[in-house]
């Protein structure tokens, strides 16, 4: 369901930014309670709760060995821009192609 999906997104990307949350509250007030995502609810299944709790932060999902630290930071930065909650703030294709991740020298990647 949509509420569960938003809860999963918060687990992976962090809390909804205040400005976006306020916008979302005007369209879907039933998803929020006292300024925060209203999840879990009393009727939320244990399966849903476990599934959402199993979500990892983005930087852990794309974890990499220390040899890739510079690349990892740039890659996570790019992903965060691509996955921005607010579509109006998401990186454009042109901006994505200019992102520092794509400026890395391929020869800098460990074998």
Report each predicted region and the residues it spans.
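Conserved C-terminal subdomain of P-loop nucleotide-binding cores
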Residues: 3, 13-16, 99-100
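Regulatory extensions flanking the kinase catalytic core
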Residues: 69, 81, 87-111
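Generic preference for well-ordered alpha-helical elements
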Residues: 2-6, 55, 72-76, 90-93
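Histidine (H) residue identity feature
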Residues: 5, 34, 71-73, 99, ...
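C-terminal lobe substrate-recognition/regulatory segment of protein kinase catalytic domains
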Residues: 10-80
């Amino acid at each position: 369901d949509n509420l569960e999906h938003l809860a999963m997104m918060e687990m992976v990307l962090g809390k909804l930014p205040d400005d976006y949350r306020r916008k979302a509250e005007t369209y879907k007030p039933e998803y929020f309670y006292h300024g925060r995502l209203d999840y879990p609810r009393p009727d939320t299944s244990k399966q849903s709760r476990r599934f959402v709790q199993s979500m990892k932060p983005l930087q852990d999902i794309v974890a990499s060995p220390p040899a890739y630290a510079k690349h990892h930071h740039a890659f996570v930065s790019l992903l965060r821009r691509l996955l921005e909650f607010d579509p109006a703030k998401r990186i454009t294709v042109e901006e994505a192609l200019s992102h520092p991740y794509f400026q890395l020298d391929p020869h800098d990647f460990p074998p």
